[in-house]
């Protein structure tokens, strides 16, 4: 069975610097260290961004996310104790009207399987994300 996970985080949007690769990785690792564990009873199993594999670097690129500027990031994650790992895809985008920066990610743990289709499924789910200014108010009858 494939393990597919999604998480969303937000924080105050302060500058374009927050869209830089290293800033996004740092924020991701802070979130993962606090909230995401391979085994919740063991702190050393928190997730981290794998940046030491030269053949598979963490890649960022500027994209349009619902016609808004965003940074897509792709790479590998692993637990701090090297027991688990896999690919992830994420998007970082701002809602300047609310002064918020959002990080949305999908990651999978499915050893021994082709994970391309799993990541594509997670991308599709992530793309349903909307910032509050994009939501429409229902028309009252």
Report each predicted region and the residues it spans.
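Surface-exposed amphipathic alpha-helical segments
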Residues: 1, 102-141
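Secretory pathway targeting signatures of secreted, lumenal, and periplasmic proteins
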Residues: 2-43, 47-50
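Secondary-structure transition/turn motif
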Residues: 10-14, 76-78, 107-108
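Compositionally biased, intrinsically disordered low-complexity regions enriched in proline and serine
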Residues: 14, 36, 89-92, 103
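Short, charged/polar low-complexity linear motifs in solvent-exposed/disordered segments
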Residues: 17, 90, 120-122
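A short, polar/proline- and glycine-enriched secondary-structure boundary/capping micro-motif
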Residues: 17-21, 83-84, 113-118
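Signature of long, low-cysteine stretches enriched in small and polar/charged residues
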Residues: 41-98, 113, 127
């Amino acid at each position: 069975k494939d393990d597919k996970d999604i998480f969303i985080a937000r924080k105050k949007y302060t500058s374009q610097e927050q869209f830089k690769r290293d800033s996004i990785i740092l924020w991701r690792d802070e979130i993962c260290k606090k909230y995401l564990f391979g085994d919740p009873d063991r702190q050393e199993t928190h997730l981290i961004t794998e940046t030491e594999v030269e053949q598979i670097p963490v890649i960022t690129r500027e994209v349009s996310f619902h016609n808004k500027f965003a940074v897509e990031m792709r790479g590998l994650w692993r637990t701090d104790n090297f027991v688990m790992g896999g690919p992830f895809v994420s998007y970082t985008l701002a809602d300047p009207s609310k002064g918020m920066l959002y990080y949305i990610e999908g990651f999978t743990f499915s050893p021994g399987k082709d994970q391309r289709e799993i990541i594509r499924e997670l991308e599709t789910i992530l793309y349903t994300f909307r910032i509050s200014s994009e939501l429409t108010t229902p028309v009252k009858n």
